[in-house]
Amino acid sequence: MNEHIIQMLPAENLYFLSGMYQWGIEVIKVIQKIENPVLTALVKFVTALGTEALYVPLILFIFWWIDEKRGLRFGILIIVSAWINSFMKDLLKQPRPFNLEPSLGMAFESSYGAPSGHAQMSLCFWIPMAAWLEKVWPRRRTVIWASSIFFVLLIAFTRLYLGVHFPTDLFAGWILGGIVLFILFVPGPSIEKFLASGGFRLQYISAAVITLAMNGIYTRDRSLPAIFLGFCLGYTLMTQRFPFLARAEINGKKPGGKVMFLRCLTGFAGLVFIYLVLRLVFPGEGSLFKETTVWGPASPFYELGRFIRYGLVGFWASAGAPRLFQRMGLASDPGESEK
């Protein structure tokens, strides 16, 4: 075990933590006895499904194609959950298994270990998903819940197999995810009614206040608060000025597969365009002007540019793309129907 890392642990917790870590290392060693190249490749693919690489496309697909309100709920839940996880990681500053036993590392993560973001995010996504799908297909309740729980456990297994999390990291992620669900998902309908009763002004103010609080509490990452603000403001503006209904009829017909494909194509193309173009223009390592002192990675405008970029990404998802769908005839346009 890496003695340098151990010496960094709080003295009063050293005995408990070192014992806990040693137990976790032994568990991982047992799991890694089944290691082989094919299984490792499969595990790395599955573990990638526990990240934004899966959640973002699924949430946007729900928002743009199935149910915009449901997409909003999933989006806010995942954004806030990810922010809380990042905050807790930096607060606890716990090592990963490969920090203590390098031979265990079959993948690399630059962030701290506990609580596991993969465990937390999978719980926060698949449990609400199961609750929703159960209402859509009540006769398939057992299959839906079994599949969701299986996927949560499968994601957790991949983190142990790759040596990037201790079992206790996973437990912490599940506990934190459960708390997030209890605070946001369970009272969700009541929160929505309260915000709706206060009108658009209350919704704008609430989004701004929550964003300020997120930035004030945790200053190391501005991207998640920015996405939250853009996503919420965009949704409020959309419902106020040009209501978008994902399943509304277009010229008397329900949107079909072609419309779905074109919405996803234009929506994701716009998302990538905004992200990449602003990354090239705004300060930072990816900027075209990074060689200049004022616009390089150490630029005083870096955080502001990053906030604007991610804010516009969130705004595009909930307002920009839906409005484009309407203008392209890919969604019903209330403005056109009034003419």
Regions found by a protein language model. Name each.
Residues 20, 39, 54, 68, ...:
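Generic structural signal for well-ordered secondary structure
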Residues 1-54, 85-111, 242-243, 250, ...:
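N-terminal transmembrane-helix/juxtamembrane module of multi-pass inner/ER membrane proteins
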Residues 62-95:
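Membrane helical hairpin/interfacial module
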Residues 12, 31, 72-73, 214-215:
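Residue-level detector of alpha-helix boundaries and kinks
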